[in-house]
Amino acid sequence: IPDDPGFYEKFYFTPGDLGFTPIDTSVGRLGVLVCWDQWYPEAARLMALAGAELLLYPTAIGWDPDDVQDEKNRQRDAWVLSHRGHAVANGVPVLSCNRVGHEASPLGASGINFWGNSHVLGPQGEFIAEAGTDPTLLVCEIDLQRSEHVRRIWPFLRDRRIDAYGDLLKRYID
């Protein structure tokens, strides 16, 4: 849970304690990872290993309006790149729904401009649909069978070195 200027969520929310369990729905098994979870490849991987057919990231992410344009671009590009990486590494489509618009700061600061750019990615990280910075309804078709094909040509889940990952359970490696 973030603790950044404008995102003081650590003071209001507690991390979940139910693990990473996909939700069975009429459209498939959804691995729902909310906001801050999207930055962690381990969360996406655990959802994929638990059988998620789609990763869904509902989020509200933006930038300080006073940031220079290069910094804004870096932040947005890193956000999209992380999603594309999760799609590729796990061989599943990724759906990211982000807020748009401006929220003023109650403290008198510049507030937050939410950058939108919601998107749907295929299992190879390719864009299937993408919104801009205005409120948008994205409608597209996703071929869930394609993930199986992608996982056969890129067997990243199969070829993991689980024997070598014990240190991932440590905060730091001594």
PLM regions and their residue ranges:
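Generic low-polarity alpha-helical segments
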Residues: I1-D3, P15-D17, Q69-D77
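A short, polar/charged loop-to-alpha-helix boundary motif
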Residues: I1-T14, P135-I153
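Short glycine-rich loop/turn motifs that provide flexible caps or phosphate-binding loops at active sites
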Residues: P5, P15, V27-L30, W115, ...
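Short, flexible loop segments at the rims of nucleotide/cofactor-binding pockets, characterized by
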Residues: Y8-Y12, G31-C35, D70-R74
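Cysteine/selenocysteine-centered motifs that mediate thiol-based redox chemistry or coordinate metal-sulfur cofactors
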Residues: P15-A50, T59, E148-D174
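Active-site beta-strand termini and strand-to-loop segments that position acidic
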Residues: I23-S26, P123, I142
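CN hydrolase (nitrilase-like) catalytic-core segments centered on the catalytic cysteine
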Residues: Q38-L138
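Generic alpha-helical secondary structure signal
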Residues: D77, L81, Q145-E148, D163
